[in-house]
């Protein structure tokens, strides 16, 4: 099986896995399948190896550390290094427009600014000083966010839409999720930075993919490769087709073709997640609320007896006040003002 088929199978497998995870992330069946597979594997994998893998996974996904920030910057650096060293130079030889070639660098500069802000900004940490203020920002729905509930770890009253982050060990106002790529929680006060960071990251990947694809197409057009022929395995001359052309380009420019495949997949994944994040912003939901929304009524505390004849209390989004108001709330979040006490 040639390289192109294997590469396409790899891309298809990766995309299918991501789509299935997104679709069935709220399904109990998926959890049962994963747990069943883990139990089967535990019978054949040595205990020492299992403990090592569990320790590694715990360190990666259940503790706060900068590993994914380093990985993020490393991958971004490798992509831009390849773009600068090869794609940019070849495109200049083919007389591409300079502003067009510099656009990825502009997007990178903006992206790094908002990446830093997302990493460093306070997501909305709840403290004794701002507890009373944050309790008044959002209404309690008494389903997902009951009144008078306290965080047993922080010993603070929990404002509506807040959540305690296990990795950061703090309660976060309007908690969305903990992002390992920025090593920080995404909350009320840094969601705006996160959205712009995600938007510029998607745009930079898509721009590099577009420039790289345009270079390869220009190269094929200039060299008239479509008019050439090649000798097949049985000794017959064949006209150049798309499959042969891609394989030829990979042999001639392996790093550029691999870069193109990587940024195309990355652009698709980022674009999908960006659309999801924008949907949540437009409807004034958080990832935490979206994930728990379908069964939040049965997770209330304290637990109460439920009569079969009574209708279950389903979570409803009471915080959406229209598209403009929802976006204004994200980009101009409510923050407490601290005044010095006069003597």
Swiss-Prot record:
Motif Di-lysine motif: where in chain: 340-343
InterPro entries from the UniProt entry: Palmitoyltrfase_DHHC (IPR001594), PFA4/ZDH16/20/ERF2-like (IPR039859)
Function per UniProt: Palmitoyltransferase that could catalyze the addition of palmitate onto protein substrates including the D(2) dopamine receptor DRD2, GSK3B or MAVS. Mediates GSK3B palmitoylation to prevent its AKT1-mediated phosphorylation leading to activation of the STAT3 signaling pathway. Also catalyzes MAVS palmitoylation which promotes its stabilization and activation by inhibiting 'Lys-48'- but facilitating 'Lys-63'-linked ubiquitination.
Keyword hit for Translocase: no
GO cellular component: endoplasmic reticulum; endoplasmic reticulum membrane; Golgi membrane; plasma membrane
Enzyme Commission number(s) of this protein: 2.3.1.225
Name the UniProt record assigns to this protein: Palmitoyltransferase ZDHHC4
Protein's cellular compartments: Endoplasmic reticulum membrane; Golgi apparatus membrane; Cell membrane
Catalyzed reactions: L-cysteinyl-[protein] + hexadecanoyl-CoA = S-hexadecanoyl-L-cysteinyl-[protein] + CoA
Quaternary structure and partners: Interacts with CPT1A.
UniProt entry keywords in alphabetical sequence: Acyltransferase, Cell membrane, Endoplasmic reticulum, Golgi apparatus, Lipoprotein, Membrane, Palmitate, Transferase, Transmembrane, Transmembrane helix
Segments in the Lumenal topological domain: 1-2, 89-100, 215-255
Domain comment, as recorded: The C-terminal di-lysine motif confers endoplasmic reticulum localization.
Coiled coil: none
Domain named DHHC: residues: 149-199
Top-rank taxon: Eukaryota
Active site residues per record: 179 (s-palmitoyl cysteine intermediate)
GO molecular function ontology, one term from the record: protein-cysteine S-palmitoyltransferase activity
TM annotation in the entry: 3-23, 68-88, 101-121, 194-214, 256-276
GO biological process: positive regulation of innate immune response; protein localization to plasma membrane
UniProt main location, coarse: endoplasmic reticulum
Entry's family note: Belongs to the DHHC palmitoyltransferase family.
Membrane topology: Multi-pass membrane protein
Stretches assigned to the Cytoplasmic side: 24-67, 122-193, 277-343
């Amino acid at each position: 099986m040639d390289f192109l088929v294997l590469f396409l199978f790899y891309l298809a497998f990766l995309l299918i896995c991501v789509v299935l995870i997104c679709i069935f992330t709220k399904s109990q069946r998926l959890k049962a399948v994963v747990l069943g597979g883990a139990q089967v594997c535990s019978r054949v994998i040595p205990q020492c190896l299992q403990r090592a893998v569990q320790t590694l996974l715990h360190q990666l996904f259940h503790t706060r550390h900068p590993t994914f920030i380093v990985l993020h910057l490393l991958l971004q650096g490798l992509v831009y290094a390849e773009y600068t060293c090869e794609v940019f130079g070849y495109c200049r030889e083919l007389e591409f427009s300079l502003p067009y070639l510099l656009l990825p660098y502009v997007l990178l500069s903006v992206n790094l600014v908002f990446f830093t802000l997302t990493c460093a900004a306070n997501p909305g940490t709840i403290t004794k000083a701002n507890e009373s203020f944050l309790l008044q920002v959002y209404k309690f729905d008494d389903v997902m966010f009951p009144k008078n509930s306290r965080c047993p770890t922080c010993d603070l009253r929990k404002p509506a839409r807040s959540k305690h982050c296990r990795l950061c060990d703090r309660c976060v106002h309007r908690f969305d999720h903990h992002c390992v790529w920025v090593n920080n929680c995404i909350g009320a006060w840094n969601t705006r930075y996160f959205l712009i960071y995600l938007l510029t990251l998607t745009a930079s990947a898509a721009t590099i993919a577009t420039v790289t694809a345009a270079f390869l197409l220009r190269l094929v057009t200039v060299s008239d490769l479509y008019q050439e022929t090649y000798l097949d395995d049985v000794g017959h001359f064949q006209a150049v087709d798309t499959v042969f052309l891609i394989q030829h380009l990979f042999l001639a420019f392996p790093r550029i073709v691999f870069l193109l495949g990587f940024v195309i997949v990355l652009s698709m994944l980022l674009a999908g997640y960006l659309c999801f994040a924008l949907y949540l912003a437009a409807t004034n939901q958080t990832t935490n609320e979206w994930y728990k929304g379908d069964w939040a009524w049965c997770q209330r505390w304290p637990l109460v007896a439920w009569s079969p004849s009574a209708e279950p209390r389903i979570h409803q989004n009471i915080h959406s006040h229209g598209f403009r108001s929802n976006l204004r709330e994200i980009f101009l979040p409510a923050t407490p003002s601290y005044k010095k006490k006069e003597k």
